Amino acid sequence: MVAKAMANESRANAEQQAMINRLANEFADELNNLGVRVSNLENKVGNVKVTGDARLRYQGSDKKGEISSDNTNKKSLFDMRGRVQFNANVNDNTSAVIRVTSGDMEFGDSTTSDVEFDRVYVAHKFGKDTTAVAGRFGAFVGNGLVYDDTFDGAAVNYDNGNFSATAAYGSFMEGGLFNNGSMSSYAHDFSDATSDENATVTLLQAKAKLGEHATVGGFYTFGNKNLDNDIYGGSLDLNYGKVWLGGEYATFSDKDGTLVQSNDKDAWVAGIGYGDYDIAKEGTWGVKVQYFDEGKYSPVISSTFNQPYNSDYKAWMASVDYALAKNVGLSGYWAFNAEDQSGNDLGDYYRAELNYKF
């Protein structure tokens, strides 16, 4: 009956076609067994894949005002975030992606909801190893110490499994640079800038596997319009089964010489971890301990790590991840023995979150 309906689908109205598509999808195996051609069934039922995630997060600090810049008396914060992503196949080599996010919404605060599109881009594959993207996408600089967030522009990436290289041009869209004390006159806020105000950068980076256990990487970010600083760095990762050791270093050069007098302009992180955490695999877990040292004029903008400060910060951080169920993960972080570069105590920082993938 379904096969006959598919054969006469052109005569059906829109409602009937939708019903035929649903039935064809439901009985795909049976139709195949009967010899009915359903190889293009995915084109009938749509070529858009919907994925997403939801997060419930708690943050706390020993000191007031470090969790929320809007409330200097607050020592803890409980918020939530939801994101939905649409991946559409335009053809065999081209795809379009749109992601909607709620932003971080604090529980009980009716003013923090801010739904927006944080991913809108197209991607085209050239052969097996090369992909070009353009639009608003996610950029991962180096190992993520300096930047892991939204990027507006275009990029070309090559990755054969053992060696990868990326060239990109555009603007960072989140975080801030040099927004610290005496450097405020040189600061740049990427998250609150018009297209005329925002800086543009050219990013070149590469990463290679050295044997079975080591991976080394490096990047160089050229400051273009509205940014007179080049940011660069390198990383090393060692993996031995479930054991990981790694670190990353980043600094900047000042092209016009105004900041040369500063010697405290670098940032680095090093750590060790154990485990095989995968949120898609129930019961997997991982633990990690890292040490962060970020100078007063650190080039960190929006880091992949969950340290509470981008600059003038030194601390240890312990973290643990556990997959409670398939696609449900619990993570906890504790930053301790924290101080600024002058030795002043900054207090401990705590973070716990539940993540859901779908």
Model-identified regions with their sequence ranges:
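N-terminal periplasmic/intermembrane-space "pro-region" immediately following the signal or transit peptide
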Residues: 1-55
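Compositionally biased, intrinsically disordered low-complexity segments
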Residues: 186, 193, 204-206, 234
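Intrinsically disordered, low-complexity Ser/Thr- and acidic-rich flexible linkers and loops
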Residues: 178-194
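Outer-membrane beta-barrel pore domains
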Residues: 10-14, 18, 22, 38, ...
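Short, low-complexity, polar/charged sequence segments that are solvent-exposed and flexible
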Residues: 151-155, 186, 306-310
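Outer membrane beta-barrel
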Residues: 46-49, 53-56, 73-182, 198-215, ...
